[in-house]
Amino acid sequence: MTKHLTLLLFIGLSWGHNGKHPFLTPYISPGIQIGLNQNKTLFMSYQLTLGTSIKITNEKHFEDTAPLFLGRTFGIRRYYQKEKPVVTYKYYDTQISFILGGIGIGKLINSKGATFKKNKYWVGAMGLLTYDKVFFNDKVEKHYGLFGVYPLPIFQILYN
């Protein structure tokens, strides 16, 4: 996973901004999260988001717009408890965000295929403060974390 993230970061840094500001800009965004749940259990998440930014004004420069980001995320979350085996979940969610914050709804899936609803909220740009609520059957669990993401515009990478 580290090799793939390093490669994606290198690709993203290799291509600069081409000055074009299309209405839709598809992107791919790898991310890594570290955090604690309300019981002080450490967790780590690795994810990949596919999405698009939408320019919601007719301004010429992207910086003069209020872009909206829509995305679909797929990831893995691991919980590390003392003297217990690591518990792994797959997850997916759909999210909407503006530049400095957003929300998402989705599901965690355990190794037996059971699903649990997950709501997530974040603030920040490439470094995010996160808050998740996971609904494990009758129990709601709160998660707090730090997330690093690196959005890469697909068309600028491919056609630059």
Residue ranges of predicted features:
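Outer-membrane beta-barrel proteins and related beta-barrel translocases across Gram-negative bacteria
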Residues: 21-31, 118, 122-130, 160
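Transmembrane beta-barrel strands of outer-membrane/channel proteins
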Residues: 30-36, 72-80, 94-96, 103-109, ...
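Outer-membrane beta-barrel architecture
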Residues: 47-51, 93-97, 120-122, 147-149
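Sec-dependent N-terminal signal peptides
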Residues: 4-13
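Short glycine/proline- and aromatic-enriched beta-strand/turn motifs that initiate or cap beta-hairpins
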Residues: 17-67
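Outer-membrane beta-barrel "beta-signal"
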Residues: 46-50, 141-160
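Solvent-exposed loop/turn segments connecting transmembrane beta-strands
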Residues: 32-46, 78-89, 107-118, 134-144
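Repeated loop/turn-to-beta-strand initiation elements of outer-membrane beta-barrel proteins
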Residues: 54-62, 67-71, 99-105, 125-131, ...
